[in-house]
Regions:
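Signature of N-terminal electron-transfer/Fe-S-associated modules in redox systems
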Residues: 1-127
Length: 127
């Protein structure tokens, strides 16, 4: 499944003071020259802070870790745990779409979600 960044992006992203200190502590856990290994924890913290991973957050993490932005984008788009679009604040549903899950009936579950929540996948309901 191709994953793209949301068309609607915030102007900027910065870690809060607490999260910035946390990020620095994470980077210090890695040997010199291996700070890029902290990309997943930093993306996770960015998502925790704003509810999803925005393009400005990806740019911020890339600059913070002194790594190419495209490498951070690759990580963010590869792992489904990173939400590239805003998600609901009350509930967020994800249904496995792999072949084994489909064989066990995940398509039926997706259809129930479409009928009860939103006809369009990857969208927010009005409530």
């Amino acid at each position: 499944m191709l994953r793209r960044l949301s068309k609607n992006q915030p102007e900027e992203f910065k870690f809060t003071k607490v999260n910035l200190n946390w990020a620095k502590a994470q980077i210090n856990k890695y040997p010199k020259g291996r700070q890029a290994s902290a990309v997943i924890p930093l993306l996770w913290k960015a998502q925790e802070q704003e509810g999803w991973v925005s393009k400005p957050a990806i740019e911020f993490v890339a600059e913070f870790l002194d790594m190419p932005e495209v490498r951070v984008l690759e990580v963010a788009t590869f792992y489904f745990m990173f939400h590239l679009n805003p998600v609901g604040s009350k509930a967020h549903f994800q249904v496995c779409g792999t072949t084994p899950c489909m064989l066990r009936g995940s398509e039926d579950l997706i259809n129930v979600c479409k009928a009860r929540i939103s006809k369009k996948q990857h969208s927010l309901s009005t409530d």
